[in-house]
Amino acid sequence: MNLHANTALRPVLHPSLRPLPLLLSLGLAACGSNYAVTPHITGQVIGSYYENAQVCLESSTSKLTCDSGSAAVRTAADGSYTLDGQGAVLATIGTDAIRHETMGDAGSKVTQKLLLRAPAGHSAFVSALSTELAQIMDGNGGDFAAASSKLAARLGVSEAGLASDFNKASGDELTKLKAENASVTALVASASTQAVPADALAALNGALALNNIQTIVVIYAENRGFDNLYGLFPGANGVPGVNPTSSTAYVPQKDVDGSTLPVLPPTWGGMTAAGQSTVITQAQSVNLPNKPFQIDDASSPLYLPQSVITRDLVHRFYNNQMQINGGANDKFAAYSDAGGLSMGYYDGSKMQLWDIAKQYALADNLFIGAFGGSFLTHQYLICACAPTYPNADTSVAKGSIAKIDVDAKGNFLRLTPSATAPTTVLNGAPAYANDGALTPADSSGMFYAVNTMQPAFQPSSNAPASGDSSKLYADTGKANTLPPQTQTNIGDLLSGKNIDWAWYAGAWKDTTALATASARASSFPNPPNFQFHHQPFNYFANMDPVKAPAYRAAHLRDFDSQFLSDASAGKLPPVAFYKPQGNLNQHAGYASVADGDAHIAGVIAQLKKSPQWKNMLVIVTYDENGGFYDHAAPPKGDRWGPGTRVPAILVSPYVKKGLVDHTQYDSASILRAITHRFALPVLDGLSTRDKALVANGGKPMGDFSAALALVPQE
C-alpha cells in the first residue's frame, strides 16, 4: 500500500501473463465496452493512530456528511483505510474506535467523538491538521496551495510536514505539529458535539478562525446600554416600536407597585450635568410619554446633542436587578434616581464608532457579566467572580452591608425601602434603608463587594494612612477600602503560561504620581478624571507595590506613554486591555458621548496602522449600561448575572464584514475568547455561569468566534 498516493489503480498484469478471458475483456473494452477501472484512495487516520474509525467520501454539498454514493469503510489497527472513488475524505471517530499512541500498542478507547476531514487529492493522512486545511479551503475558494502555505507559515513548519505523518517528524517541527494537532483536536471535539453537521462546521470554523488572532485588544468604555447608542442600527435588535428589526414590542414602564405609569417620571434634578452651557431642567422634563425617547432629536424641546454631558443615573448591583424585573425590563424609570432620563437613547449614526460597526461587526446580544455598576463589572471582566470581604460584619465596613428583602427561599426580591420612600415614582426618586457596597453573608458566611469600594494599593481615592511612609497603600481603616483579593484572574492564567498581557489605563502614570506624593492633594484633576475603581487588577494581592513591584510594572501600564507607542512598534502583548480616562469613556455625568466616540475611533485608527493589525482582534464594549433602559431580556444565569445588554463592536481583518452578530455573549465572553485562543485553564466563574444558563433552559455564552472568518476579509 502506498500511503502517500491519493489515488491508485488496481495492479495491471503484463500481456503475456494475462489469462484469455481478461485479454478478451480488454479487447471488448477497446471496442467500446463499458469496462472501467475504479480508482481508489488509500491513507491513514492519525492523531495518534485511530483503529475502527469510519471513513467515507465527504459530500460536496453537505460538509461533515458522507456522500450518498460512498460506501463507508473501517480503519485497521494502524489507522489505514482504502476507499473506492475519489474526493474529499471524512473520518468519523466514534467512541467505538481505539486510539493508539504508537502502532502496535494495546490502545485505549476513544472517549469523545471526532469528525476529521481531508481535502480531495490530499487525504494520505487524515488528521486534525488536514481538517484545518480543509476548513481554510472552504473559505478561500478551494485553493490547497494557499491554505497549506498560510498554515505552514503560521505554525513555522514545512508544508511537507503538514502533509506527512507528523508522529514521525523530529525536533522543533515535531513539537510544533503535535502542539497544533492537540489544540485543533480539542476544537474538533468540542464542535463534534453539535447534533447538526452544519452547526458543527460553523463551530469549528469559528474556533479555528480564533487561532488566526495573535493579539487581542479590549477597549472597555463606560455606561451605555445597547438601545441607548445602537438602538437604531439597521438589522439589529433595537429600540422596540422604533427599529423595525426589534425582537419585541415595547413593554410600558411600571410604577413601584406594578401599575402602568401614565407618563414617565420627571428627570430628577434636570437632564444635564453641572457646568454645561445647555441646560434642561427637571420642570422641562415632565409628562414625557411612557416610551423610549430620542435625547438628540433636534425637533424636541429636550434636545441635547451628543457633545453635551447628561446627568448621571444610578447603576448598582441590586438596583439593576430591580429594573430588569425578571426580564420584563419595565422598572427602569421606577428604580432610577434620574427618572425619565433612563428611557433616553441617541441616534448612534452620528458616531464614528457606528461607521466602524457597519464596516466590521456589531454584536447585539451581549449582556454585562455582572449586575450593576462599574466596580463589579470590572472585577467580573478579569476573574468572572465577585470580590470577597471576609468577616465584614465585624469589620470597619459593617455599616456597608446592604439591607434587602428576600422570599421564603432566601432569594432576592428588592432593596428594603426606607421609611420615607415615595409610594409612587411620580412623586420622587426611590429611597432605600441601606444600598450598601456589600451583600449580606451567603450560606458559607462570606460577604461580597458588589458596589464601589476602593483598592488597598495606590492609586486609590483613599489616601495612605498617616503612618505609611511608603505612600503606596490606601488607609485600611477606611470602611470602603477593600482587602486585597486572592481569587484567580485571567492575568494569573496568562502569566502561568508565560503569555504576556497588560492593563493600559489612561492617566495611570500621572495619577499614580499624584496619589503617592508626599504632599498628596485632596482632589485629583478633571480632566482626566481618573477613576480608581476602574482598575480591577489593582485590587489583587499579587499586585502589591512593595512585595511585587516588577510584576506590577510589567502588567499595569500607562496608556499615554506606552499604549500607542507599543502598538506602533508592534510590541503590544498578546492580550491588552485599555481603559480610557474618565472624560473620554462616555460615562454619563462626567463624559459626553461625542468625546469618547472620537477618542476610541482614533485609537482604533492607530491600531490599524500597527504591524500587529493583520492578526489582531479589537473588542470595543461597555462595562455596563449606566442605568439606561434596554429592552432585551438577559438570559437567566447565576447570582452575579448576566445583567443588562450593552453594545460590542468587533474589529479585525478576520471579522465577517457588515455582520450583525446575534450570538449570545456576556462580558466574560472576552475571557472565553482569551481562554480558548491561548488554551488556558477555565476560570471557575465561567463554568459556573455556563452551567447555570443551561440549567435554566438556556445555552452557554459564546467566545466571539462566530463573528470571525477563517481567511482575512481585507
Where are the regions a protein language model picked out?
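Bacterial N-terminal signal peptides that target proteins for export
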Residues: L3-P21
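C-terminal motif of bacterial Sec signal peptides marking the signal peptidase cleavage site
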Residues: G27-A30
